[in-house]
UniProtKB/Swiss-Prot annotation:
This is Aspartate 1-decarboxylase. Belongs to the PanD family. The gene is panD. It is an enzyme of class 4 (lyase). It comes from Xylella fastidiosa (strain M12). Binds 1 pyruvoyl group covalently per subunit. It is found in: Cytoplasm. One of its GO terms (biological process) is alanine biosynthetic process. SUPFAM superfamilies: ADC-like. One of its GO terms (cellular component) is cytosol.
Length: 126
């Protein structure tokens, strides 16, 4: 059986640009792309924390260290500059692989500078 697990997440990034007439995609600061282990042109899910919108697109590289998170093309209608978003990607793997797999979690500040990384999410308690 193949399972779909969270591969990578950039948590609560701030949308810095929104380009309706660009060719689509989400441009992500190259430093964040690498830290998350995301590839250019990889399918990503975007979850807008500010307005609840959810959509998929593909990632492209923005300038390394720029802090750019730019939602482009038709997807630009789902965000505004300043919105908080979560960028996530999933990977398919066997049960044996899933038993030892840990995702790349990247956390950023309001300027999209990486603050820290992790490979697990704390257990939620009441």
């Amino acid at each position: 059986m193949q399972l779909s697990l969270l591969k990578a997440k950039i948590h609560r990034a701030t949308v810095s640009h929104s380009e309706l007439n660009y060719e689509g995609s989400i441009a992500i600061d190259g430093l964040l792309l690498e830290a998350a282990g995301l590839y250019e042109f990889e399918k990503v899910h975007i979850w807008n924390v500010t307005n609840g919108a959810r959509f998929t697109t593909y990632a492209i590289r923005a300038e390394h260290g720029s802090g750019i998170i730019s939602v482009n093309g038709g997807a630009a209608r789902y965000v505004q500059v300043g919105d908080l978003v979560i960028v996530a990607a999933f990977a398919q793997m066997s049960e044996d692989e899933a038993a030892v797999f840990r995702p790349n979690l990247v956390y950023v500040d309001a300027a999209n500078a990486m603050t820290h990384t992790n490979h697990s999410i704390p257990t939620q308690v009441a």
